[in-house]
Each structure stands twice: as structure tokens, then as C-alpha cells.
């Protein structure tokens, strides 16, 4: 399991936060069940590297003590997009966690080959599982979808030990008819001759 080191932050002022960001560190907080929240700072590059690779669960070493943590929330600067804050939740072995996981679509839908348009619904879902079973992402095969078909949460193939906490009917992806096809169909319906009595 990947590991990064954090230092404890004694000051929690805006000036201290700005100083850390200039030094290439990201301020954050580490918390968990029966644990007092601890203000920490981590190396921005190390954290970004883990996040870019989709790793949300790793070890965090604080003052020589290592905890298994989950990245619960990331805050980015609204203009620059740089990381400005992170929340780490300490997780315990044997205790289930809930976490947002991205859904990655793969395959070229049959409906798109026939001229349809692939529309995305949910791009991530909340899952519940043990920390060691947490997937980086959930794959969804859309290759068999025809025009008018949709893939719902209930259709996702999940890894063992993982359960989705979302409405099973929520749409992940759907194939809609091309706009000109819909307009053509409407014109045909409206211009049909009326039956005479």
C-alpha cells in the first residue's frame, strides 16, 4: 500500500495556510471514529500523484504513527485548480466504509454505430465495502446498448464485497436518437393524412 508522510500543523490561520501552499504543501485534517481531529500538511506533489492514479486509500504517517486513511474530500482553488485542502478519514480493518467511486464506460455502443448519441448519467456512485475491497473505479460495458437503451445502476457488475448505495434505477448511460431522426419522426406524425368519415 502506498504511503505518504504528513506533518502536524500547530497554527490554523489563513496566513499559515498560504505559507504552506507556497512551500508546495497542502493543509488538511485527519479524523476518524474515536480519534481527535488533527490538522496536518502533506507534500502537494505526493498527494497529487496518488490522486491522479485514482488511489483514495493509502497509509499516512504522522509523527511516526502510520494510519490507513481514505481521501474523503479534496478542495481546489476556483481559479488555478490547485489543491488547497484535503480531508483524510482514518479507516479500520473490518469496518465498512462508504466512498464515491468513478464509473468508467467502455466499448462502442451499437446504437452509436447506428447514428445514436451516447449520453452520460451518473459519472460516479457511492459504494459500501471493506477498505481493502474499495475499487479505484467501476467499469460499465456499453457496447450492447441500442438506440433507446440505457444502462442503470442495477445493471453494473460489481466486484465481490462491494455494494452500490444509489437508486438502482438511476441512469449511468443512455443512447438517444439523433436530433434529425426525432424531428423527421415528428414531421411524419403531424403530416399524416386525417381519416375521413
Curated annotation (Swiss-Prot):
SUPFAM superfamilies: Ribosomal protein L25-like
Presence of keyword Iron-sulfur: no
Pfam family, one: Ribosomal_TL5_C
UniProt keyword annotation of Nucleotide-binding present: no
GO terms classed as biological process: translation
One GO CC term on file: cytosolic large ribosomal subunit
Family: Belongs to the bacterial ribosomal protein bL25 family. CTC subfamily.
Name of the protein in question: Large ribosomal subunit protein bL25
Organism annotation: Carboxydothermus hydrogenoformans (strain ATCC BAA-161 / DSM 6008 / Z-2901)
Originating gene: rplY
Amino acid at each position: 500500500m502506498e504511503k505518504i508522510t504528513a506533518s502536524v500543523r500547530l497554527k490554523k490561520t489563513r496566513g499559515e495556510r498560504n505559507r504552506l501552499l507556497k512551500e508546495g504543501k497542502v493543509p488538511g485534517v485527519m479524523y476518524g471514529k474515536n480519534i481527535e481531529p488533527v490538522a496536518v500538511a502533506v507534500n502537494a506533489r505526493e498527494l497529487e500523484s496518488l490522486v491522479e492514479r485514482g488511489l483514495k486509500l493509502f497509509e499516512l504517517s504522522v509523527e511516526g504513527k502510520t494510519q490507513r486513511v481514505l481521501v474523503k474530500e479534496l478542495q481546489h482553488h476556483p481559479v488555478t485548480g490547485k489543491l488547497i485542502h484535503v480531508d483524510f478519514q482514518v479507516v479500520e480493518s473490518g469496518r465498512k466504509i462508504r466512498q464515491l467511486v468513478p464509473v468508467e464506460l467502455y466499448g462502442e455502443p451499437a446504437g452509436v454505430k447506428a447514428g445514436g448519441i451516447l449520453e452520460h448519467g451518473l459519472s460516479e456512485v457511492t459504494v459500501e465495502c471493506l477498505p481493502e475491497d474499495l475499487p479505484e473505479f467501476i467499469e460499465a460495458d456499453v457496447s450492447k446498448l441500442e438506440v433507446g437503451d440505457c444502462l442503470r445502476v442495477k445493471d453494473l457488475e460489481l466486484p465481490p464485497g462491494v455494494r452500490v448505495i444509489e437508486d438502482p434505477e438511476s441512469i449511468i448511460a443512455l443512447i438517444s436518437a439523433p436530433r434529425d431522426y426525432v424531428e423527421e419522426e415528428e414531421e411524419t406524425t403531424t403530416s399524416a393524412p386525417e381519416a375521413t368519415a
